[in-house]
């Protein structure tokens, strides 16, 4: 090969190698960019909700001939699909209840601006628990707090704070309401807020901060709802509402709601005679509620809700140790599962219970006649055996010398099971404490535990003589 041919050959080879290197660098660049965008491709969820996902740092060291490429993907916030809650995990096995939270609202009102409230409850989103109550449009140390014993005024609003944070002046007023229920479907909060005239009230359905639907009174006699959390399964939320006599036949309906819109209404069916102020919990694939019979029974009604076909059944808790107040003493009280016991049925108080196999856990006032003291216990066979009375694992939450009030259930989903928790309303002021003109409350909260626990009493604790009049 002559010198000219050698030069041409070397030049051609060099040009070919250079071309290959150039094309490879283009391929590397395209691959890197493609991987970058594929790494962060995420489906956009409905209603534009995003949750931060863990950032992933990808380092690529690619060596090609004499070129070194170091590519680092920056940290990014990636939209992650938020799913509806389905509550399909089993119920936690518990030995009793352990202290969880206490807000001390009345004690703090002696020296601070705290709302006057009643009808409190607790509900949780997937990450945090909140306390709710119906405010009276005034703080306690304020002349507007006079005569706040009345349940229904146009100034009452639903208040919402993180659990354990008393309702201070900066508290959010979610809606106008003198009766309410709230629950989180996994994507957003639903609030059911009842207000208006006794004979023509309105229930507003607020979802994700927006008014979505409403319904008017259907019996023109104090439309009212649960005063505790509703329950959502796979995007369908259920709420029990009653309109009609508080001491006679009333018209109870179960509303099915999807993202704030009423999609179905079922009438109450089964053997329950009177149903108010239900304490509901998820019992997959349905919802179960323990309610107040304010007409015939001191045994509590049970309402079973089928979320799939909208069917309803109702009965009564079988335990002969009954849960309402007033009631007969435990020796003479009865319950036979299907019907009201006709024992001191007129009047009552909101309460709760939940099934545990054939047994039942329940809470009630210690007093048989007044809203004083509070206790919890398990009744063996109390869910399935008529008039069962074998009580175990009794705990005192509030001693009998101190006032209690409404109580209700809420559910918390853990890693492997669903825990049941309850709150107790600790009422202070009128009617019993006539030194002051106001009526308000604080709360104490307990949750189920599989561990051991001690004893105590957790009353409101405010000295009424130190309180504003």
Swiss-Prot record:
Region of interest: Hypervariable stalk region: 36-88
GO biological-process terms attached to the record: carbohydrate metabolic process; viral budding from plasma membrane
Signal peptide: none
Region (Involved in apical transport and lipid raft association): 11-33
Active-site residues from the entry: 151 (proton donor/acceptor), 406 (nucleophile)
Single GO MF descriptor: exo-alpha-sialidase activity
Protein's cellular compartments: Virion membrane; Host apical cell membrane
Catalytic activity: Hydrolysis of alpha-(2->3)-, alpha-(2->6)-, alpha-(2->8)- glycosidic linkages of terminal sialic acid residues in oligosaccharides, glycoproteins, glycolipids, colominic acid and synthetic substrates
A GO CC annotation given for this chain: host cell plasma membrane
Organism superkingdom: Viruses
The record's account of how the chain is modified after translation: N-glycosylated.
Sites where a glycan is attached: 61, 70, 86, 146, 200, 234, 402
Disulfide cysteine pairs (residue numbers): 92-417, 124-129, 183-230, 232-237, 278-291, 280-289, 318-337, 421-447
Binding site for Ca(2+): 293, 297, 324
Topology versus the membrane: Single-pass type II membrane protein
Region (Head of neuraminidase) residue spans: 91-469
Keyword Disulfide bond recorded: yes
UniProt main location, coarse: virion
Cofactors that this protein relies on: Ca(2+)
Miscellaneous comment as given in the Swiss-Prot or TrEMBL entry: The influenza A genome consist of 8 RNA segments. Genetic variation of hemagglutinin and/or neuraminidase genes results in the emergence of new influenza strains. The mechanism of variation can be the result of point mutations or the result of genetic reassortment between segments of two different strains. Strain A/Udorn/307/72 is a laboratory-adapted strain.
Function description: Catalyzes the removal of terminal sialic acid residues from viral and cellular glycoconjugates. Cleaves off the terminal sialic acids on the glycosylated HA during virus budding to facilitate virus release. Additionally helps virus spread through the circulation by further removing sialic acids from the cell surface. These cleavages prevent self-aggregation and ensure the efficient spread of the progeny virus from cell to cell. Otherwise, infection would be limited to one round of replication.
Subunit-level organization: Homotetramer.
Listed name of the protein: Neuraminidase
Phylogenetic classification of the source organism: Viruses, Riboviria, Orthornavirae, Negarnaviricota, Polyploviricotina
